[in-house]
From Swiss-Prot:
Alphabetized UniProt keyword annotations: Cell membrane, Exopolysaccharide synthesis, Membrane, Plasmid, Transferase, Transmembrane, Transmembrane helix
UniProt topology in membrane: Single-pass membrane protein
Tree of life domain: Bacteria
Record-given protein name: Exopolysaccharide production protein ExoY
Family to which the UniProt record says this protein belongs: Belongs to the bacterial sugar transferase family.
Species of the source: Rhizobium meliloti (strain 1021) (Ensifer meliloti)
Signal peptide segment: none
Example of a GO cellular component annotation carried by this entry: plasma membrane
Main location: membrane
Its job: Needed for the addition of the first sugar (galactose) to the isoprenoid carrier. May function as a sugar transferase.
């Protein structure tokens, strides 16, 4: 993996020459991650293949989408998802912002749009059910993510974390976490940062298990997902 690109004076990243800081949870958390992700990948493999077919045949485009996110110790990795947007989504979004300046303010504040013009019909269903994130099980097995942890962010989002960024960087980003079970997109970005900080400061394997079990009703009820 490549290191995130920022100046050496940045407070957000731990310089490589100082040595890597071990992620929270150590071997216990990593063992749980590998076991849980492997079992989930096996159990959901029929659904995985069905979604692959639906995405491919919906518009003939690519099945997966990988976007660069910042992980543990500031390392950059490609966060995998099933593609839920049009192939030329950036052009569509630029035109949408030109016509709807208020939407740009929503985007700048949360990095999300409640009515995103780039999302396909199949993609909207996958997002509503959080099924677009199933490929992140592969990120977990590869050691880039964890089952539970802070929401993976892009590089410029860490500026919104301010001094709390150091807590984000101590953990691998998670497939689920406090933010996902507490309203997701219905909560402010500042609240999301507070959730991530609280999680890292108070980590325990038992807390991870509680979050995993609470994720099930949150996903089934589509709380805050769009």
């Amino acid at each position: 993996m490549k290191s995130a690109t920022r100046s050496a004076s940045s407070p957000f990243f731990i310089p490589e020459e100082t040595g890597a800081v071990r992620p929270i949870g150590g071997m216990a958390k990593r063992s749980f991650d590998v076991l849980a992700a492997s079992v989930a990948l096996l159990l959901f493999s029929p659904l995985f293949l069905l979604i692959m077919a639906l995405v491919k045949f919906s518009d003939g485009g690519s099945v997966f989408y990988g976007h660069r996110r910042i992980g543990h110790n500031g390392q950059s990795f490609k966060c995998l998802k099933f593609r839920t947007m049009m192939e030329k989504g950036d052009e569509v979004l630029e035109e949408f912002f030109r016509i709807n300046p208020d939407a740009y303010e929503e985007w700048r504040a949360t990095r999300k749009l409640q009515n995103d013009p780039r999302v396909t019909v199949v993609g909207a269903v996958l997002r509503k059910l959080s099924l677009d994130e199933l490929p992140q099980l592969l990120n977990i097995i590869r050691g880039e993510m964890s089952v539970v942890g802070p929401r993976p962010v892009v590089e410029d989002e860490l500026e919104l974390y301010d001094s709390a960024a150091v807590f984000y960087l101590r953990s691998r980003p998670g497939l689920t976490g406090l933010w996902q079970i507490s309203g997701r997109n219905d909560v402010s970005y500042a609240t999301r940062v507070a959730f991530d900080t609280q999680y890292v400061q108070n980590w325990s394997l038992f807390a991870d298990l509680v979050i995993v079990f609470k994720t099930i009703p949150a996903v089934c009820l589509s709380r805050g997902s769009y």
